[in-house]
Amino acid sequence: MTVIAWDGTTLAADKRAISGGGICRTVKKIERFDNCLLAISGSWDVGVELREWFKKGAIVNAFPESARKDEATLLVVGHGGLATYASGPYPMSVEDTRYSTGSGRDFAEAAMYLGKTAREAVEVACVFQSDCGNGIDEIVL
């Protein structure tokens, strides 16, 4: 229900969110915050809780209980690298130059492996993954 791609310079994401019985909505999954870029995938409500927890300082003892179910991922991209938060308050640092997440990640990973940009990778995923689409947002770090 999401595809988010990072190519080392640009973060891109589709805009489709599916609620209830399959109604599609258009949303923004990525944003700039201070000196980093944030992206959420998975359950929208849980992802937003993770994002807001991070923006308030990522206090370990204040980690959202709903996130412990591992239904969403928060991606944080900064000049120091890339990290993800999922079911706990400690990030997983990712050393790879390229990264993608969400249901369209395999298509995006393959596209970037073949030299496509993050935006182009999201475009490819939106063609082949039926729950990705509704446009693309992108932010350059």
List PLM regions with ranges.
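N-terminal nucleophile
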Residues: 1-141
